[in-house]
């Protein structure tokens, strides 16, 4: 019986590895025996549709979730603010990375929320997707096309594709997806990409505010977290929560569950300071130090980046920056290693052209942030 169980496990593993390759054959059989259909793969009108749950995905850090594409586990308690508990359904930072021999690719998705856009962020960024291809000559991911959406019932697009070219698909920033499917030619295969040249296979985890979340760029690939991932060739997890990144102790527990290569803490925008008259519960003096100490205790060897408040556009020196700089100096004096400090002066170009509203970055502002955060992560990882 033991050998039988081992054989069964091997067969299941092999079946999972070749699920797309065998789909055409399986769907032929399914015409005559519905019990032989491959779950999650359907061929209609000359397109083989593969459910996103079968595709290689990055940016999805937890399996014990309420919905498959959630960013946090179902067990998040009321000790974490309601904004986080609501926006955990957003798919910011999630992406599919694969290679296929199909000559055309189709994409269809159904958004989680009915609201597709904001007054300062278009539907293409809030609820759309975008596609990149890897250019072997330059060694860079190059933008291909944006999947735009105008109907809350869902959207679909198709593009030509060069077989064998690695593909990256970024999911929506300020919305989630109820359903996602990739369409390829009936006999095409889809495979996960190989190891990264950077050698970094564990994700860089970003925890922060609306700016980390992706507000307010034009499309998902322009969120600075996604840019950093492409530029440094590292996987990323985006735990930015608009208006809600306040470093509750429980959130440090959730971050510590992730087997990360680096943590980036960028929450000051949403936090207050007792020195400035803030109320209790959302301020740096109460929350920051217990949070970072617990994270380091749970993950002692993982580098941490402490980012100042990127308020070049919205104010000068503030009590929050002063506090975390003093905390950083104290931790270094205690002997902490692998701790990187990112000052706000590195983050922006120094004028308002990089924003949509004086605070939230547009695409240009996101590129400036990506250079700053990318530099800090590069230093933390020794790249």
Language model regions located:
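Catalytic nucleophile-elbow at a beta strand-turn-alpha helix junction centered on a G-D-S/GDSL motif
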Residues: 201-225
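N-terminal secretory targeting modules
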Residues: 2-8, 24-203, 378-383
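Short helix-loop-beta junction
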Residues: 225-238, 329
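Surface-exposed cleft-lining segments at the edges of enzyme active sites
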Residues: 210-215, 237-243, 269-282
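Residues at the starts of beta-strands that form the adenosine-phosphate
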Residues: 203, 235, 302-303
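Bacterial N-terminal signal peptides
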Residues: 12-21
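Intrinsically disordered, low-complexity acidic regions
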Residues: 213, 218, 234-237, 247-250, ...
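Alpha-helical cap/lid subdomain in secreted, periplasmic
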Residues: 6, 89, 249-383
């Amino acid at each position: 019986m033991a050998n039988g169980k081992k054989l069964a496990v091997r067969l299941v593993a092999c079946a999972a590895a070749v699920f797309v390759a065998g789909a055409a054959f399986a769907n032929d059989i399914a015409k005559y025996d519905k019990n032989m259909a491959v779950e999650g793969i359907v061929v209609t009108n000359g397109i083989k549709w593969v459910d996103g749950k079968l595709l290689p995905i990055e940016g999805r850090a937890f399996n014990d979730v309420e919905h498959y594409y959630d960013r946090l586990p179902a067990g998040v308690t009321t000790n974490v603010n309601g904004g986080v508990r609501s926006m955990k359904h957003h798919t910011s930072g999630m992406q599919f990375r694969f290679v296929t021999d199909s000559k055309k690719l189709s994409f269809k998705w159904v958004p989680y929320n009915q609201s597709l856009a904001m007054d300062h962020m278009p539907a293409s960024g809030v609820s759309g997707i975008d596609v990149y291809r890897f250019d072997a000559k330059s060694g860079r991911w190059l933008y291909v096309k944006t999947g735009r959406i105008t109907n809350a019932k869902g959207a679909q697009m198709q593009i030509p594709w060069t077989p064998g070219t690695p593909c990256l698909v970024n999911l929506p920033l300020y919305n989630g997806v109820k359903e996602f499917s990739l369409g390829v030619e009936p006999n095409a295969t889809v495979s996960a990409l190989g190891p990264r040249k950077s050698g970094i296979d564990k994700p860089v985890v970003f925890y922060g505010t609306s700016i980390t979340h992706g507000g307010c760029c034009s499309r998902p690939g322009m969120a600075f977290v996604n840019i950093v991932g492409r530029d440094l060739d590292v996987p990323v997890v985006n735990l930015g929560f608009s208006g809600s990144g306040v470093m509750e102790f429980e959130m440090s527990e959730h971050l510590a569950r992730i087997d990360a290569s680096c943590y980036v803490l960028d929450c000051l925008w949403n936090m207050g300071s007792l020195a400035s008259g803030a109320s209790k519960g959302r301020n740096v003096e109460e929350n920051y130090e217990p949070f970072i100490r617990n994270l380091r205790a749970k993950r002692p060897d993982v580098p941490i980046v402490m980012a100042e408040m990127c308020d070049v556009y919205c104010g000068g020196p503030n009590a929050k920056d002063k506090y975390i700089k003093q905390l950083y100096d104290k931790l270094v004096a205690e002997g902490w290693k692998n701790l990187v400090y990112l000052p706000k002066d590195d983050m922006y170009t120094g004028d308002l052209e990089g924003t949509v509203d004086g605070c939230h970055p547009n695409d240009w502002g996101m590129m400036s942030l990506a250079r700053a955060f990318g530099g800090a992560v590069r230093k933390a990882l020794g790249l």
